Amino acid sequence: QTQKLLNNPSGKLVFKVADGKCGVAVEIKNASEFTPASIVDFMEKNSFDLVEEFIIQHPKLTELSPSAVNTVRIFTQLNANNEVEILGCRQRISVNSSVDNMAAGNLAAPIDEVTGIVIGPAVYSDITKPEEINHPVTKIPIVGFQVPFWSETIAMVKEAALLHPQNRSIGWDIVITENGPGFIEGNHDWCKLLWQLPAKKGLKELLEKHQL
């Protein structure tokens, strides 16, 4: 299994700590630097708990921003009838960073739930910085960007939300590859800034009807 990991198609490995958040304590290394034995030594020496292959994202997302895997965040909420409601969708966009988290200085933009099109400019968590209509490095338009495989992404997330009814509200991190969407993780304590800043308004009323 370790050798298979070292031979993954991207040629890269992602090391993480188990309790990491916001892109902190993440390191990306070339798989060619390791053997099955040395990878364990490296993790123990540097206090890493997890290692996974670096995922190759969809070419359109690489064109938008090649420095990191640019994930989609979708917020789901189970209502009183155990039906899945979408609270919001965001495209995270890296800016010369190996991670895409807003807390690490990157961008996030609102996505239309129905079409999968980015419908507003991207913003930073630092509200003193200007919003971005185009990517500041690649100059690719952000507003109007079509997230690939959108209908498949929404269907996948809704199905997953129903599998975890004990967690009523989850912030899903989705990677879009050339073969379709896949899960990175689901967050029970999802970031309210990522939810509200791209919308440019408070969204508390969406939670109040669920008594949250």
Predicted regions and their residues:
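ATP-dependent carboxylate/phosphate-activation module, predominantly the ATP-grasp catalytic core
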Residues: 64-65, 69-155
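Protein kinase-like catalytic core scaffold
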Residues: 13, 85-87, 182-184
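C-terminal active-site "lid" helix and adjoining low-complexity regulatory extension at the edge
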Residues: 130-158, 162-169, 176-212
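Generic recognition of flexible, low-complexity loop/linker segments
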Residues: 2, 60-63, 158-161, 170-173
